[in-house]
Curated annotation (Swiss-Prot):
EC identifiers of the protein: 2.7.7.101
Named cofactor requirement(s): Mg(2+)
Protein name in UniProt: DNA primase DnaG
InterPro entries found in the cross-reference section: DnaG_primase, Primase_DnaG_arc, TOPRIM_DnaG/twinkle, TOPRIM_dom
Methyltransferase recorded as keyword: no
Note on cofactor: Binds two Mg(2+) per subunit.
Organism of this sequence: Methanocaldococcus jannaschii (strain ATCC 43067 / DSM 2661 / JAL-1 / JCM 10045 / NBRC 100440)
Catalyzed reaction equations: ssDNA + n NTP = ssDNA/pppN(pN)n-1 hybrid + (n-1) diphosphate
Pfam family, one: Toprim_4
Residues annotated to bind Mg(2+) 1: E177, D219
Length: 424
């Protein structure tokens, strides 16, 4: 391996010498200096050029094979392009080395500056890429935003629950399990979030659920399922979102969080499924006890339950009337005329009755203006009553007439009568 100092070298001449006989390295070097001396004058004399540093050390790699000698000659040059070419051509005039006939052929002239330029270009690209990655404007913006969002976490209520700054101002809130979940949602720009912080549901969460639309967002594990069930028992939950199985909310990416929240389902469906599962467990326990007692059971006729395409349980209609399909008490007869008046109108209309006053509004108007009514004698709804509507209206009235009712739970003080019973 030839090692050269290329500090001032511009070109390297590569030549090959073949001698018909056995020669040694010093013979080749002597031939190079001896046979080129005086050919081009003092300006291009190899000895003079070496003294002035314009030509570097001449290296020779010699191999002797089958009575012949093959030498690879390397000449570093700091001359210009023309002078280097002349010097290379001069080497080809060598015809003898010692007593042997020889020929020299220039193989290549390498431009060192070209290689350096190529190296500079490639290295500059690498450095630029590194600089661009280190000074990524988007990354800086995200880091600044994240630091601001991290600082937005507040302590809410007497229990000092971790929450986002928009819990009070937003009409709906997202309830999560812990502080880390709140921080992760804040990083994603979601500010109407509050944490339960423990297994016991704080009173602050219960009170918020009465005034706001609540989405519960829990981990995809057993613990998340237990917290969800407790929240469903004590809070007015509207929607439920779950992290993917085995994952926690705090470790989800922004894309995963948004996907989970978009896939939220009404709490009524979860409650219906819980009731269905509980019924199955109770039936199994009962059967096991009877079997252990040795009593023969009569096969059970199971009611049909309609399952929708997305595995949501369709809650069957619940007719909540005081008469249990018996004739209605006379006190309700006065509402028949209102029913006949309402069915002539379009669906989703509501008739509000307060003494002698009657008012026809849409369901949406009724929901939005509930606070305008202190109490209502009766409400007749030309449509289906849902659990959400019951939860909103039961504090304003204790009598509702409707086409149909699909609910999970009915307040004790509320009488709910369908048009079928009213018109019987």
């Amino acid at each position: 391996m030839i090692i050269m100092d290329l500090g001032t070298t511009k070109y390297i001449i590569y030549a090959e010498l073949i001698a018909d006989g056995y020669v040694e390295k010093h013979d080749v070097i002597g031939a190079i200096f001896g046979q080129t001396e005086g050919l081009l004058g003092d300006e291009l004399d190899l000895r003079e050029l070496q003294k002035t540093g314009r030509v570097g050390r001449i290296d020779v790699e010699l191999t002797n094979i089958n009575g012949k000698s093959i030498a690879k000659i390397t000449v570093p040059s700091s001359l210009d392009r023309i002078e280097t070419s002349i010097l290379a051509a001069t080497l080809e005039t060598i015809d003898r080395v010692g007593p042997c006939v020889a020929t020299v052929k220039v193989i290549d002239i390498e431009d060192i500056r070209k290689k350096k330029r190529e190296y500079i270009v490639e290295r500059a690209k690498e450095i630029l890429k590194q600089l661009m990655s280190n000074i990524d404007v988007n990354t800086i913006i995200e880091e600044v935003k994240e630091s601001v969002r991290m600082g937005e976490i507040i302590e809410y209520g007497p229990e000092r629950l971790p929450a986002g700054p928009a819990v009070d101002s937003s009409d709906d809130i997202i309830v999560v399990e812990g502080r880390a979940d709140v921080l992760n949602l804040l990083r994603c720009g979601i500010k109407n979030v509050i944490a339960v912080e423990g297994t016991s549901v704080p009173k602050t969460i219960i009170e918020l659920s009465k005034k706001k639309i609540v989405t519960v967002f829990t981990d995809g594990d057993r613990g998340g399922e237990l917290i969800l069930k407790e929240l469903l028992q004590v809070c007015d939950v509207d929607f439920v979102a779950r992290a993917p199985p085995g994952k926690e909310v705090e470790e989800l990416s922004k894309k995963e969080i948004m996907k989970c929240l978009r896939s939220k389902i009404p709490a009524e469906h979860i409650l219906a499924q819980i009731l269905k599962d509980k019924q199955k467990i109770d039936e199994k326990v009962c059967k096991d006890e009877i079997r252990n007692m040795g009593i023969q059971t009569i096969p059970e006729i199971k009611p049909e339950i309609s399952i929708t395409s997305n595995d949501d349980v369709e809650v069957s209609s619940v007719e909540c009337n005081p008469s249990n399909n018996e004739e209605l008490p006379p006190k309700y007869n006065k509402y028949r005329k209102f029913y006949e008046k309402l069915i002539e109108l379009e669906d989703s209309k509501v008739l509000i009755i307060n003494g002698d006053k009657e008012e026809i509004v849409s369901i949406e108007e009724l929901i939005n203006n509930t606070d305008n009514y202190k109490s209502i004698d009766a409400i007749i709804i030309n449509g289906t009553v849902t659990q959400k509507l019951i939860d909103i209206l039961y504090e304003k009235t204790n009598l509702i007439f409707c086409k149909d009712a699909k609910i999970i739970k009915k307040p004790v003080n509320l009488t709910l009568i369908t048009f079928g019973d009213l018109n019987a």
